Amino acid sequence: MSGYADTSFLVSLYVLDGNSARAAAEMKHAKLPILLTPFGELELTNAMLLRLFRRELSASRVKAAQALVRKDIEDGIFLLRPLAGSVYERAKQIARRRTPRLGSRTLDVLHVASALVLQADTFYTFDRSQAKLAKAEGLTVP
């Protein structure tokens, strides 16, 4: 049993927002480590830098948040796992099955496929449409 966190959840862990308290509470009950892919790490980095561009975060705050992410990976809170090539075939299968009814976005499909290929059973997200997709694919969304 393991969990997978998408970017909406990860950003809320490292950048104060309306979901930060909920993210922290979920982490207290989560079975560690939480799975993270290089794709997820990239998306998290870009989300923080986008907030810098929009002047929602200072450069020093982004640097501090990125240092916390690295520390949490080093401390084993998150386990960085590479994406196998099979994730893309799984994502195509999910897209064919779910997108016509749910209107799923490509990166949402890729996150859910990643969680499934990595054998996660719990999916942490604050994105409602992604949560619907994850639940439809049998993942538990707290």
Each language-model region and where it sits:
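Short acidic/polar alpha-helix capping motifs at helix-coil junctions
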Residues: 12-14, 34-39, 74-79, 93-98
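Active-site-proximal, substrate-binding regions of enzyme catalytic domains
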Residues: 45-96, 136
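A generic local structural motif
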Residues: 20-22, 67, 109-112
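A general structural signal for well-ordered secondary-structure junctions
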Residues: 20, 32-33, 75-79, 101, ...
